[in-house]
């Protein structure tokens, strides 16, 4: 029975789950208790393994910042309520024959959910402004602490003006300290491992649709151990009761 459940779950999620994620799936969906070593062994017997993560160095052009903020978040990634602390970042993706697209996202540290995201062919301030416009439409009264790196998009005068108007306090990573924004970096790693590296995207629209589908899956169907083996949507709903 366990082997059948493992195989079905693996196929249903396109080979994404490793043995740790599979343990949560077996417990949540099938009520099957099994230790990690046994699941690891069963997956090896079945010839099932998750996609291996590829690591890629990121290089950014240094642009004089119009505004910078202190590292107020200071790696305090726990949160007691929704819309208390959010982190944001941009990552580069490719499609076609090397064309570039840029994905901007905001993650809430309470439910570990993606609040808003935006994809563009240009890595500029309008990209992040569009992302936050979506976030404010969902939560018009939210005034979170917002943490980001010191990219030119987040240090621009126009972005600072918009955050000030919305009553949002900015926090920024120290120079060269990517771990200051570890939850966002972690999300990019998950998205690329479980979605981006699995396919070759022929065009921009295919990339956009696949990202939309994956983030919906991430928010509503992907269990997280840090959330008590619940999905972000389940965790937020449970906390509201």
Predicted segments, located by residue:
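RNase H-like two-metal-ion nuclease catalytic core shared by retroviral integrases
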Residues: 62-63, 148-150, 156-159, 172-192, ...
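A short acidic/small-residue loop/turn micro-motif
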Residues: 108-109, 119-124
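C-terminal domain-tail junction helix/linker
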Residues: 164-168, 190-241
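Hydrophobic "anchor" residues
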Residues: 113-114
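Mobile-element integrase/transposase regions
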Residues: 32-105, 127-130, 138-143
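DNA-recognition alpha helix
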Residues: 19-31
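Short, small-residue-biased leader/transition segments that mark boundaries at the very start
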Residues: 1-6
């Amino acid at each position: 029975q366990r082997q059948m459940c493992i195989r079905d779950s693996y196929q249903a999620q396109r080979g994404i789950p490793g043995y740790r994620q599979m343990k949560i799936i077996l417990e949540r969906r099938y009520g099957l208790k099994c230790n990690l070593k046994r699941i690891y062994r069963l997956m090896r017997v079945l010839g099932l393994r998750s996609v291996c993560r590829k690591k890629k160095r990121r290089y950014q052009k240094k642009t004089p910042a119009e505004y910078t903020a202190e590292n107020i978040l200071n790696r305090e990634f726990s949160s007691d309520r929704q819309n208390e602390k959010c982190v944001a970042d941009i990552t580069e993706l490719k499609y076609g024959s090397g064309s570039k697209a840029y994905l901007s996202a905001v993650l809430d540290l309470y439910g570990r959910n993606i609040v808003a995201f935006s994809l563009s062919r240009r890595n500029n301030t309008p990209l992040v402004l569009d992302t936050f416009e979506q976030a404010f439409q969902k939560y018009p009264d939210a005034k979170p602490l917002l943490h980001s790196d010191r990219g030119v998009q987040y240090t621009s005068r126009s972005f600072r003006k918009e955050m000030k108007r919305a009553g949002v306090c900015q926090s920024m990573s120290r120079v060269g300290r990517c771990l200051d924004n570890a939850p966002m970096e972690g999300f990019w790693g998950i998205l690329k491992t479980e979605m981006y590296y699995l396919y070759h995207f022929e065009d921009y629209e295919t990339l956009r649709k696949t990202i939309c589908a994956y983030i919906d899956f991430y928010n509503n169907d992907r269990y997280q151990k840090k959330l008590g083996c619940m999905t972000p949507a389940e965790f937020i709903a449970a906390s509201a009761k």
